[in-house]
Design a protein with these regions (language model features):
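Short, Lys/Arg- and Gly-enriched loop/turn segments at beta-strand edges
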Residues: 42-51, 89-99, 237
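FNR/FR-type flavoprotein reductase catalytic core
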Residues: 71-216
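Short Fe-S-cluster ligation motifs
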Residues: 235-239, 243-283
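Structural signal for conserved beta-strand scaffold positions within catalytic alpha/beta enzyme cores
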Residues: 6, 51, 154-156, 209, ...
Length: 283
């Protein structure tokens, strides 16, 4: 069993948890992920590793409570235990040799962009970190991101914090200003990553994206995480999750990502009905 050592609310529906998982922490690297189950009857969900501490034997995860399983996870408290916490899975991000990098995070993707930027910064690279959010109320890890980069650019859709702009606008301006990046790393909603790739394509800048796809087993057997990269079928869990963004077929990936929306809504509704029934019974 994997104990929750720390639980922190980052915004209205985003939680941070530090999990006791020494075997995972020992080998974890930025870009990798874990698969967890809240209970023996629960579904398996993949979450990218947000941070890790080898000495303490802990792994940090950050998640939004958007589905039945993440809601169940968010309802747990410090001292509670998870049934499964498997990892690290996937290939670690290839960051060696990069001297100047733009890291672009969108929304919850900033939780994954942060360890990438942190590792690069620790390696001595110059890092421009561009973080985009809908509004000031959902900004996460601002102080942590400031300490993990050379320059932090926060943008919001409504201008309530930082500049009112899209992450692609800031990225293009930085490139046009003469910044010669060895690579751009983009992590966030697929539509955002798609347009980051379209922004960098004319400049020929290597652009890496982290593909958060449907996933069940994390070993490539289920085929749920398949996507098309350079005209070939790849599996995010074993071939990724990092890929050359200029080769990814984002349109097909987004269609696959929406396949189970109806089932996800039904699961949330069932959970809400169960919770309401339980409240009535205990009164």
């Amino acid at each position: 069993m994997y104990q929750i050592l720390k639980k922190q609310t980052l915004n209205a529906n985003t939680k941070l948890m530090v999990i006791e998982a020494p075997h995972v922490a020992r080998k974890a690297e930025p870009g990798q992920f874990i698969i967890l189950r809240v209970s023996a009857e629960g579904e398996r969900i993949p979450l990218t590793i947000a941070d890790f501490d080898r000495e303490k034997g802990s792994v940090t995860i950050i998640f939004q409570e958007v589905g039945a399983t993440t809601m169940a996870l968010g309802a747990l408290n410090e001292g509670d235990c998870l049934h499964d916490f498997v990892g690290p899975l996937g290939k670690a991000s290839e960051l060696e040799g990069l001297k100047k990098v733009a890291v672009v995070g969108g929304g919850l993707g900033c939780a994954i962009a942060y360890p990438q930027a942190k590792k690069l910064h620790e390696m001595g690279a110059e890092v421009d970190l561009i973080a985009g959010f809908r509004n000031k109320d959902i900004i996460i890890l601002e102080d942590e991101m400031k300490n993990a980069c050379t320059n932090l650019h926060i943008v919001t859709d409504d201008g309530s914090n930082g500049r009112k702009a899209l992450v692609t606008q800031v990225l293009k301006e930085l490139i046009d200003a003469g910044n010669q990046y060895d690579a751009v790393i983009a992590i966030g909603p697929m539509i955002m990553m798609k347009f980051v790739c379209e922004t960098t394509r004319p400049y020929g800048i290597k652009t890496i994206v982290s593909m958060n796809t449907i996933m069940v087993d994390g070993t490539g057997m289920c085929g749920g995480c398949r996507l098309t990269v350079g005209g070939e079928t790849k599996f995010a869990c074993v071939d990724g999750p990092d890929f050359d963004g200029h080769l990814v077929d984002f349109d097909s990936a987004m269609r696959r990502g929406a396949m189970y929306k109806a089932q996800e809504r039904a699961a949330v509704e069932r959970r809400a009905e169960h919770c309401n029934l339980f409240k009535k019974e205990v009164k």
